[in-house]
């Protein structure tokens, strides 16, 4: 019992450390990303960078499939929400002061490094073939590209998401945004209780199944 308490206390400390570095104003929106491997890789990168919220839209209304072999459990620590009207949702974020940054290849697009990701940001990445929908591009504040010097004009969507998010992380680290929680203490406690409960319940079920 004492050992179980010590393990739980250590786990809670780790969960809190993670929450204190979560960036609640750096959000990812996956627009019709259909491949579960790509989507799962995006989830894992979100967790690694400190993204707390990942929204997605599926043109066929399907729920996103998670490949746990790829996420390695990281999907438990990112809030993943399905959206039925992507434009409406993104406009809601704009009204809250977020900049909408969409990956899009055009003459108006800028190098992804030229964007200030320390501002409240929603990064929109698109479908593997068509990219981000024109309706979303129209309302985007920034359209970005990753410089390419080979024959291919684009990267895999999960790779591109990772590159952009790590630039956002670099900028935010330089500004000290990972050194202070973006979540309030009330928000931390609320999420911590949810995470801890789900984590402990799953661990106990695993222990019982192997005993």
UniProtKB/Swiss-Prot annotation:
What GO biological process, any one, is recorded here?
tRNA guanine ribose methylation
According to the UniProt entry, what is the EC number of this protein? 2.1.1.34
Catalytically driven reaction(s) = guanosine(18) in tRNA + S-adenosyl-L-methionine = 2'-O-methylguanosine(18) in tRNA + S-adenosyl-L-homocysteine + H(+)
Alphabetically, the GO molecular function entries are: tRNA (guanine(18)-2'-O)-methyltransferase activity; tRNA binding
Q: At the top level of its lineage, which domain of life is listed? A: Bacteria
What keywords sit in the KW lines?
Methyltransferase, RNA-binding, S-adenosyl-L-methionine, Transferase, tRNA processing, tRNA-binding
Residues annotated as binding S-adenosyl-L-methionine are: 103, 146, 155
CDD domains (UniProt xref) = SpoU-like_TrmH
The keyword RNA-binding belongs to this UniProt entry's keyword annotation? yes
Stated role: Catalyzes the 2'-O methylation of guanosine at position 18 in tRNA. Type II methylase, which methylates only a subset of tRNA species.
- Report the family membership: Belongs to the class IV-like SAM-binding methyltransferase superfamily. RNA methyltransferase TrmH family.
The subunit field of the Swiss-Prot or TrEMBL record says: Homodimer.
* Listed name of the protein: tRNA (guanosine(18)-2'-O)-methyltransferase
